[in-house]
Amino acid sequence: MRKIKEISADTMTPISVYLRLKGKNKVILESIPRENDQSRFSIIALNPVKHIKFTDGILSVNDEIISDENPMEFLEKLVCQPESTDENLDLPFTSGAIGYAGFDTYGIFEGIQPELKDSIGTPDMYFMLYESALIFDHKREKLIFIEDNTYSQRSEKELQNALSANIESLSLLTEAENELTELSKLNFVSNMSQELFEEKVAKAKELIRNGDMFQVVLSQRLTADFTDNPFNYYRKLRVENPSSYMYFMEFDNFHVIGSSPERLVAVHGNQVSTNPIAGTRKRGQTEFEDQALIEDLESDPKEVAEHKMLVDLGRNDIGKISKYGSIEVPVFMKVEKYRYVMHITSEVTGELRPEFTAMDALRATLPAGTLSGAPKHRAYQRIYEFETQKRGIYGGAIGYLTKNGNCDFAIAIRTMVLKDKKAHVQAGAGIVYDSVPEHEYQETLNKAQGLLKVGQ
């Protein structure tokens, strides 16, 4: 059963609605234009009915341990309802799971579990199951309120009461809407020195030259004290560094804030797609400088070879679950500009085979080659030898799985994790045989700038 109410939203924004809503574990997912295109939907969800966590091999639902279950298969069985249909609803999400599967999830499934310190302390996988959602349709300037009982079996009266409460909350102006205070200066400290990072790059290059692998992504983590309002940080981030995937997620004891430019995988019906991004330059100060940097990027043999290799890896990942002959690359090596950097981007698509699902697509693509390397399995093993801490959420997948089996996941890059009054930002660089260590170190900092400079 579902209750839906649509109202005019021409005087509202996702931010004002989010601030007025009363509820727990609120999340907001937005897609902000990269250049001049118009993004259609923003998603807000609140009051999840279940918390699904997977930590160090232990699966739990609302903190009750579930034995002998593969967490992704369990999530799919819990969320997806084959008999459900969203006919006549041109909406990306009505109910389902929102959350993340971290980088280390792959290692758990593949038996690669080194004894590395987890210095942040977040679950390897954490999804919240939502029946209460609000969808902004920016094209039609409408706000759609949705209350569903797929997972909780709430009565019709309970659904109507919840719907009415959310609508009524929008009539109350909050002080927070007009009080966007200045952020404190964040003094980030890396988990390794520049010298140490460059030593690791040199060692990785030696392995590559010896034929151990073709590419590996090495990263550094930057940490700072954080005492500001997390949502104020998101409000500034979305203005100062807009991107394809914007998200603010309020978990039980931590927050995840991000502005990721890169799709890991999306499934809509039987169509599956991934969006490799590799090849980076900082933005120029002028249009002339920008164009010169674009030409330099497009003619750099190292960047071009790396990108082509990762497109091939994306084709291979999507090919595992797609019909033979259906793989296409509709976008190949297009340069896209962001606030602080520009990237070479491509898109790989396929037609999902009938025996596979959205979670199979996630398993096939996680982690992205752009965050691990090639061959993926070997590069993943080497990452754990080079890096001294579990990556956690960084490099994993952030997004949603709907009850009708669709999904959309971004790669967890340009992402900040806030926990225990600490802000954690991680960024990496793809190392190949002709990488220059100091250039790769600088690339990690360039990629992190969109988060490090917010409000500064």
From Swiss-Prot:
Top class in the EC scheme: lyase
Pfam families reported for this sequence: Anth_synt_I_N, Chorismate_bind
Catalyzed reaction equations: chorismate + L-glutamine = anthranilate + pyruvate + L-glutamate + H(+)
Protein name as annotated: Anthranilate synthase component 1
Cofactor detail note: Binds 1 Mg(2+) ion per subunit.
Organism ancestry: Bacteria, Bacillati, Bacillota, Bacilli, Lactobacillales
Stored SUPFAM superfamilies: ADC synthase
Species this protein is from: Lactococcus lactis subsp. lactis (strain IL1403) (Streptococcus lactis)
Assembly and binders: Heterotetramer consisting of two non-identical subunits: a beta subunit (TrpG) and a large alpha subunit (TrpE).
Gene name linked to the record: trpE
